[in-house]
Amino acid sequence: MPEVKVPELAESITEGTIAEWLKNVGDSVEKGEAILELETDKVNVEVVSEEAGVLSEQLASEGDTVEVGQAIAVIGEGSGNASKENSNDNTPQQNEETNNKKEETTNKSADNAEVNQTNDYNQQRVNATPSARRYARENGVNLAEVSPKTNDVVRKEDIDKKQQAPASTQTTQQAPAKEEKKYNQYPTKPVIREKMSRRKKTAAKKLLEVSNNTAMLTTFNEVDMTNVMELRKRKKEQFMKDHDGTKLGFMSFFTKASVAALKKYPEVNAEIDGDDMITKQYYDIGVAVSTDDGLLVPFVRDCDKKNFAEIEAEIANLAVKAREKKLGLDDMVNGSFTITNGGIFGSMMSTPIINGNQAAILGMHSIITRPIAIDQDTIENRPMMYIALSYDHRIIDGKEAVGFLKTIKELIENPEDLLLES
């Protein structure tokens, strides 16, 4: 019988964790239909069946780690059970069998069965994250009765809000809250022990690898944001009118400045592969996005060929996809340089950690008004931002790193030059 195997995902991804089975044993499966959701280091992907038939066996359970090429399910012949989405579209024979079964049971049993079937149907058709589905099952919550806060996608916090509502507003019985586990080393102190998500474990592993396998160093500079802020203020309304509502932000300026600096200092756009150094001739800039599952870095492709509006629109689109868990692998791999903005969280200064397979990362920070000496006789309050470049000293010398950051500073302080180049 045909097997479903973990597909090839990306060169850097060799395994994943089964987040949720979308089909149960005995369910009918169409060719190309998703049967499970797989959580990888970067994104969640749906694994589809290459054959039509019946899911006759699940070779791994939710939470199991599976490798690329590993068999995870068996598809048998036959029509199987109707899927949950089509549970109401019964054939005449199925309807007759259902009627016969109802006659053999009490009205109460039939009513309970019907309610359970409806709940199962509602659980399946509601748009929810995999973790929210598991959380709802564990706590006996009907997802159909949970109101999502954003983007029509039910998340764990929406379920918590539902459970915390007054008892009079509840329509289903809630399962008792889980007892907090106690860490044995401190038996008298309350702690919570929980498994890290696959993505969190992978991030921790990669961050440690970067620290251990690179000669990482950080250099700093400061940028006077006066001119770019004034330019943005003058142009933003007309910019939105000219570009279908796309907002002019600071990220496009820093992205364009980074491309110019990368062209001037190509070592910053390189990586080490064994005994070779690979200098990239393309400019795919990663933009760090904070999500409920941690920090994700999708890439804006070919930034040297895009104008300000195209870059801003792409950044906004990738941010939405990241927060709605809709990023694909193509969005997450093979970048050349990364920009992270700790300023949105209030960070004044930091040393960002290099993204995998890259030589450097640019860190933006909060804009803070402070007194600056304009000349020997003049001090003015100016909106200032500290910028940081963490880099692999094996590839990039200090001279190039300082020069790169100085180029960023000069371009941001003279933003008209960036607009002319674009």
From Swiss-Prot:
E2 component of the 2-oxoglutarate dehydrogenase (OGDH) complex which catalyzes the second step in the conversion of 2-oxoglutarate to succinyl-CoA and CO(2). Residues 80-94, 114-130 have a biased composition (Polar residues). It comes from Staphylococcus aureus (strain bovine RF122 / ET3-1). One of its GO terms (biological process) is L-lysine catabolic process to acetyl-CoA via saccharopine. This is Dihydrolipoyllysine-residue succinyltransferase component of 2-oxoglutarate dehydrogenase complex. Residues 164-176 have a biased composition (Low complexity). Keywords: Acyltransferase, Lipoyl, Transferase, Tricarboxylic acid cycle. One of its GO terms (molecular function) is dihydrolipoyllysine-residue succinyltransferase activity. Pathway: Amino-acid degradation; L-lysine degradation via saccharopine pathway; glutaryl-CoA from L-lysine: step 6/6. GO terms for cellular component: cytosol; oxoglutarate dehydrogenase complex. Residues 1-76 form the Lipoyl-binding domain. Residues 77-184 are annotated as: Disordered. The keyword Nuclease does not apply. Binds 1 lipoyl cofactor covalently.
